[in-house]
UniProtKB/Swiss-Prot annotation:
Involved in the biogenesis of TorA. Acts on TorA before the insertion of the molybdenum cofactor and, as a result, probably favors a conformation of the apoenzyme that is competent for acquiring the cofactor. This is Chaperone protein TorD. Signal peptide: none annotated. Belongs to the TorD/DmsD family. TorD subfamily. It comes from the Bacteria. Its main location: cytoplasm. GO terms for cellular component: cytoplasm. Pfam families: Nitrate_red_del.
């Protein structure tokens, strides 16, 4: 059973947002391979995520045997999230929702961004239907202590498109299963917390 307090949720959602927003740098990958994240992995394994964490660990071990590991992981990221919608699992709600649903999502997301005065780095050029924006809003709702709003946001806005997104991620073959395991962790946490 997954039991997380608010601080743990915020930390884990932030970690997932960072991993799923952009490719890991060579330095970040080295931190993973050097065990900097071992305490987090151990904690998540205790939260009924052992299978997914084992996949992450095995992927990191597999990468440690490659001379340009960070480039291989970047290629996995690109193949999974950056190609066209036929070949990638695009991390945008617009790739999975009907036009009507998307318009409702965008209106609500934009309302929350304004309400919580959240601004994003415009150099990233991510529209408000990007996964990172949704996760940042979830983190903000968690920080505000609004458990019911967080739950409703997860149920009605995140899972509405993340379940088909994750199904597509799982079907795409890459050198490692690192990102497939990460998206499984996200879906499992959202479904069980």
């Amino acid at each position: 059973m997954i039991t997380l307090n608010t601080e743990e949720k915020i930390f884990i959602y932030s970690w997932l947002k960072n991993i799923l927003s952009h490719e890991l740098t060579e330095q970040q990958l080295q931190q993973y391979q050097q065990g900097v994240f071992t305490p987090l992995f151990d904690f998540l394994s205790e939260q009924d995520l052992a299978e997914q964490i084992n996949t992450v660990r095995n992927s990191l071990m597999q990468l440690s045997n490659l001379p340009l590991a960070h480039l291989e992981l970047a290629a996995d990221f690109a193949q999974l999230f950056l190609l066209n919608g036929e070949n990638s699992a695009l991390p945008y709600a617009s790739a999975y929702l009907s036009e009507k649903e998307l318009n409702q999502h965008i209106a609500f997301i934009d309302h929350l961004l304004l309400k919580y005065q959240l601004k994003f780095d415009h150099s990233l050029r991510e529209p408000s239907d990007h996964l990172a924006v949704y996760l940042e809003l979830l983190i903000t709702l968690e920080k505000s202590g609004q458990k019911e709003k967080s739950f409703n946001f997860i149920q009605h806005y995140l899972l509405a498109w993340l379940i088909p997104f994750n199904k597509k991620v799982q079907k795409i073959k890459t050198e490692t299963s690192f990102y497939q395991a990460i998206t499984e962790i996200l879906i499992t946490l959202l479904n069980k917390t």
